[in-house]
Amino acid sequence: VTAAAPTAPAAGPGRVPGPGPDPGPGAPAPTGRLALVLAPRGGRTVAVRQFHAGALRVLRPHRLDGSGQPCFVVVNPGGGYLGGDRYELDIAVEAAGTALVTTQSATKVYRSPAAPARQDVRLTLGPGAVLEYLPDQLIAYEDADYVQSTTVSMDPSACLVASEVVTPGWAPDGTVFRYRGVALRTEVVMDGTTVVLDNLRLHPAEDAVAGLGFLEGRTHLGSLLVVDPRVDRALVEQVHELLAAAERRLPLLRCGVSELPVPGLVVRALGPGSAELTELLLDVSALLRGRWTGQGRVALRKY
């Protein structure tokens, strides 16, 4: 896969550019848009700018521990994504800020007969910023077609931990892989240069997604992307040992870890269900949190 490297917008010292521009005159409004700019104030990270429109909202942040890190929960009151829908999510964390962002529930994609449902996610991290982006699973139902583009512009000193779990939704005949397509593209940019590019494409009607080289008899897929200057070979080996132990406990799991060209790692896991994969990715996250910040395992409270 090849892609042109975008140029990061200019920003003042210790600050990050704000969320992406509004649609121009005559451009169709997105189905839902949410923009957050987060910055440290008085030892805690707070939202210094917040905007939402259409079918995206964010709940008042709560604190999961005493670290001062806020947890923001993104909500879609519409309940699901339909063909032709377009969502935009912009999150910027300024220098030394820290935040955890999740969703209130799974992202449910329904029939998309004419056009795919799309979501554009733009994450911006300033120097020393920390963002844990841990949404609930993506569920693609029968005839669903979903395209997601995630672009991360981050300072080399920042920390990103981002997860994704893809789940085949229920179909009337009880079979799996009845969705039309799931395409997830993630690009990480540092100093105007693309340093990580991951392009995941699942099209059951065109590819034998259940076969060798794809899901290999499993139905669910999980990924965890970590970009942080503290990642080294020893940490990658620790993660590998954690994954190997998980495979011994749960024989239906298949998982691995790879080191990135920049300090970072990516975990890919196949399994029989979203719960097993979510727990596995949170186990890896807990290892990183314990080593880097002394925080405990993420225990999300959702209402």
Task: Cite the ranges covered by each PLM segment.
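Short, structured patches in soluble enzyme cores that scaffold and shape functional sites
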Residues: 93-95, 103-105, 125-127, 135-137, ...
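Structural motif
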Residues: 98-100, 130-132, 159-161, 222-223, ...
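N-terminal, charged/glycine-rich beta-strand/loop interface patches
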Residues: 2-137, 142, 149
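A structural signal for small-residue-enriched, beta-sheet-centric alpha/beta enzyme cores
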Residues: 166-303
